[in-house]
């Protein structure tokens, strides 16, 4: 997060820096937790954050499980964050620079947990959006299915899975698929998520896979093959309409999260509210990007060697 006039245009952006979070997305998880309280469970011990970079959700998890928890027994608690991009260290968090679709990543997570299953898995990952909503929604659902495959292998029965989604035309397909694995599916929209965005979060409560299904992560296995035997692979969009039963579509409960007194994520605040820190100057970023794709371009620009096409 950089220094700019965005501090005034987006108060969640500013508040994140004031409170030491690396990104404004931290407030999305906090507001989801205010509604569902999945991080307030005293028995929550093993947590996985997928697609975690730059690490704001991992920061929330660290503070909830270690800094703010009233429990004195915190030795057994573990947080593992996974991302293809490198992440700067976070207290109480083990970071893995790894691919969530690879079996070796699964093995590394289970080893860190002592071969115990996770209580909670979350994913705030999203692809680089193109502006083509149908394409963005499709790619995002593929990312969710990849996260779900890993989650199915590491989440304990009764556990919770939270992931970012893009609400589009066929999102009820995803609701139906997740309904085969979880007792309750809720689509939640935090106040800190811009109302103009298709972004929302799927909250899956009570992991309850079929008793005769054993998930196995394999790089050579397709999504359909992975979910073979748990009925989820029955639901797919086919060009042949006769293969699709409209009655199988589910409508998930929709819930807005966050207090009505919260800031409007779509509003521009020219005068900072009194609840925001007194200074109106721009704040330094909490954590600079570790290896941004634009790093070389910045170096060339600062040295005056960046050429412009005519």
Curated annotation (Swiss-Prot):
Binding site for S-adenosyl-L-methionine: 25, 55-57, 83, 99, 124
Cellular compartments per GO CC: cytoplasm; cytosol
Compartments it resides in: Cytoplasm
Catalytic residues (UniProt): 164
The protein's enzyme class: transferase
Quaternary organization: Heterodimer with TRM732; for 2'-O-methylation of cytidine 32 in substrate tRNAs. Heterodimer with RTT10/TRM734; for 2'-O-methylation of position 34 in substrate tRNAs.
Family according to the record: Belongs to the class I-like SAM-binding methyltransferase superfamily. RNA methyltransferase RlmE family. TRM7 subfamily.
Remarks, miscellaneous: Present with 4110 molecules/cell in log phase SD medium.
Function: Methylates the 2'-O-ribose of nucleotides at positions 32 and 34 of the tRNA anticodon loop of substrate tRNAs. Requisite for faithful cytoplasmic translation. Requires TRM732 for methylation of the cytidine at position 32 of the anticodon loop of substrate tRNAs. Requires RTT10/TRM734 for methylation of the nucleotide at position 34 of the anticodon loop of substrate tRNAs. May modify position 32 in tRNA(Leu(UAA)), tRNA(Phe(GAA)), and tRNA(Trp(CCA)) and position 34 in tRNA(Leu(UAA)), tRNA(Phe(GAA)) and tRNA(Trp(CCA)).
Protein known as: tRNA (cytidine(32)/guanosine(34)-2'-O)-methyltransferase
Gene responsible for this protein: TRM7
């Amino acid at each position: 997060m950089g220094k700019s006039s965005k501090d005034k245009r987006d108060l969640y952006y500013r508040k994140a820096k004031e409170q030491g979070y690396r990104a404004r997305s931290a407030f999305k998880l906090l507001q989801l937790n205010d509604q569902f309280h999945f991080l307030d469970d005293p028995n929550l011990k093993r947590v996985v954050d997928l697609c975690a970079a730059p690490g704001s959700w991992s920061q929330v998890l660290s503070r909830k499980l270690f800094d703010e928890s009233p429990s004195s027994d915190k030795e057994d608690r573990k947080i593992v964050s996974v991302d293809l991009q490198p992440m700067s260290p976070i207290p109480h968090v083990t970071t893995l620079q790894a691919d969530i679709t690879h079996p070796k990543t699964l093995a590394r997570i289970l080893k860190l947990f002592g071969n115990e299953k996770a209580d909670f898995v979350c994913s705030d990952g999203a692809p680089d959006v193109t502006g083509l909503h149908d394409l963005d929604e499709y790619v995002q659902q593929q990312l969710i299915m990849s996260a779900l495959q890993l989650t199915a292998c590491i989440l304990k029965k009764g556990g919770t899975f939270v992931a970012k989604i893009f609400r589009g035309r066929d999102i009820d397909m995803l609701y139906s698929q997740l309904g085969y694995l979880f007792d309750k599916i809720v689509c939640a929209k935090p106040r800190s998520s811009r109302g103009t965005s298709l972004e929302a979060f799927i909250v899956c409560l009570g992991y309850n896979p079929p008793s005769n299904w054993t998930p196995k992560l394999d790089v050579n296995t397709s999504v359909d093959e992975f979910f073979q035997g748990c009925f989820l692979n029955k639901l797919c969009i086919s060009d042949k309409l006769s293969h699709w039963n409209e009655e199988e579509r589910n409508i998930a409960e929709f819930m807005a999260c966050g207090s009505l007194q919260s800031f409007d994520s779509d509003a521009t605040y020219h005068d900072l509210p009194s609840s925001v820190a007194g200074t109106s100057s721009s704040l330094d970023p909490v954590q600079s990007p570790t290896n941004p794709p634009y790093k070389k371009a910045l170096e060339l620009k600062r040295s005056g060697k960046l050429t412009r096409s005519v």
